[in-house]
Curated annotation (Swiss-Prot):
A GO-annotated cellular component: cytoplasm
Native organism: Exiguobacterium sibiricum (strain DSM 17290 / CCUG 55495 / CIP 109462 / JCM 13490 / 255-15)
Catalytic function, reaction form: tRNA(Ser) + L-serine + ATP = L-seryl-tRNA(Ser) + AMP + diphosphate + H(+); tRNA(Sec) + L-serine + ATP = L-seryl-tRNA(Sec) + AMP + diphosphate + H(+)
Superkingdom classification of source: Bacteria
Protein name per Swiss-Prot or TrEMBL: Serine--tRNA ligase
Length: 425
């Protein structure tokens, strides 16, 4: 959520920045009218409350002097009724204004490339050598079937499309990657490991920005206040909702493994085969709470930690700075990390690393004090996938495939695979 004071003071500049996102600015124009109405109602209410206070004093004085106070009491009651009506109108206006503010996206940072499509995203760096096969690269979905490590057909029978059964070496590879990533982030990078709930309430989904705007993308548990988590970012960020932290606690870093659930609304017909776009998938997420002045330095750190996973797996990748139109609703700045997929001849997203500045913290009321008696300030929150596990499996299958249809296990994963070096059919 954007600071309402900042929105008033820098309205034109903020409107211009949001226009670069390609956003409909109707809500911005409604904000002006609603904010003026709110301030007008507050002013009227304060005047009437002052009149009521004066009337109360006058009535007390009349009674002390044993004079008739009926007329003054009637007048005070009328003022009281007017105050009550204005308070109710003010509550309605503030509720509408708050809902409107919840629907306005974050303000892009000045360093974000201005663009209108994904073609305007800027490649920052390419890392690693792409494999040079002397055979035609096989798509990972065909490799999975040939190696019998994933069962899509039975998952479709049991549940539906965009679900899989991992089996045998496939299940072990998925589990190995989760353990490898969590060990790396905890043991080397100093994160505290979190295993979060897989359901969260509406306040949590609102705090991190999924609600109210993107409710159709979420899986809601019918007749409850619960949603299945679309990412561990939601429960982990909301761990500190409505809390005031101390400065010496910051930065806080959590690494969380969770299953994630997404409806993939709007993705009909896209990536219908393979592991790229599933309704249920595993992911390791990094979440950081930091001081405002440190958040952009921390974004570089976080992105580097996500990259480290790919470097250790020796998977070629590129890092992009996402343009204004491709930032997502909550981010002030975002890097995407894309891994090379030989069968398609393209890079595919495997991680997003974002700085939300105080956008989520303001929604979730996550603050800190620099000193014991200092005024609380909003923290800055960041998160990044490190990594999406199913997509990492897909990348390993494609980049480590052999001419005979087998797949070599990356060396760093072999201790997690019981020493297995090759998956064979």
């Amino acid at each position: 959520m954007i600071d309402i004071k900042r929105l008033r003071q820098d309205f034109d500049a903020i409107q211009e920045k949001l226009a670069h996102r390609g956003e409909d600015l109707t809500d911005m124009n409604r904000f002006i009218a609603l904010d003026e109405k709110r301030r007008e109602l507050i002013a009227k209410t304060e005047v009437l409350k002052a009149e009521r206070n004066e009337a109360t004093k006058k009535i007390a004085e009349l009674k002390r002097n044993k004079e008739n106070a009926d007329e003054a009491i009637a007048a005070m009651r009328q003022v009281g009724d007017e105050v009550k009506a204005l308070d109710e109108e003010l509550r309605e206006v503030e509720a509408t204004l708050n809902l409107l503010l919840l629907g306005i996206p974050n303000i892009p940072h000045d360093s974000v490339p201005i663009g209108s499509t994904e073609d305007d995203n800027v490649v920052i760096r390419e890392v690693g050598d792409k494999p040079a096969f002397d055979f035609e690269a096989v798509p990972h979905w065909d490799l999975m079937e040939q190696l019998k490590i994933v069962d899509v057909e039975r998952a479709g029978k049991v549940t539906g499309s965009r679900f899989v059964f991992y089996r045998g070496a496939g299940a072990r590879l998925e589990r190995a990657l989760i353990n490898f990533m969590m060990d790396l982030h905890q043991d080397k990078n100093g994160y505290t490991e979190i295993l979060p709930p897989l359901m969260v309430n509406r306040d949590s989904m609102t705090g991190t920005g999924q609600l109210p705007k993107f409710e159709e993308d979420a899986f809601k548990v019918e007749d409850t206040n619960y949603f299945l988590v679309p990412t561990a970012e939601v429960p982990v960020t909301n761990m500190h909702r409505d809390e005031i932290l101390s400065a010496d606690q910051l930065p806080i870093g959590y690494a969380a493994y969770s299953q994630c659930f997404r409806s993939e609304a709007g993705s009909a017909g896209r990536d219908t085969r393979g592991l790229i776009r599933q309704h249920q998938f595993n992911k390791v997420e990094l979440v950081r709470f930091v001081k405002p002045e440190e958040s952009y330095e921390q974004l570089e750190l976080l992105t580097g930690q996500a990259e480290e996973v790919l470097k250790l797996l020796k998977l070629p990748y590129q890092v992009l700075s996402m343009c204004t139109a491709d930032l997502g609703f909550t981010a002030a700045k975002k890097y995407d990390i894309e891994v090379w997929m030989p069968s398609q001849g393209v890079y595919r997203e495997i991680s997003s690393c974002s700085n939300f500045e105080d956008f989520q913290a303001r929604r979730a009321q996550i603050r800190f004090r620099r000193e014991a008696n200092a005024k609380p300030e909003f923290v800055h929150t960041l998160n990044g996938s490190a990594l999406a596990v199913g997509r990492t499996v897909a990348a390993i299958l494609e980049n480590y495939q052999q001419a005979d249809g087998s797949v070599v296990i990356p060396e760093v994963l072999r201790p997690y695979m019981g020493g297995l070096e090759v998956i064979q059919g």
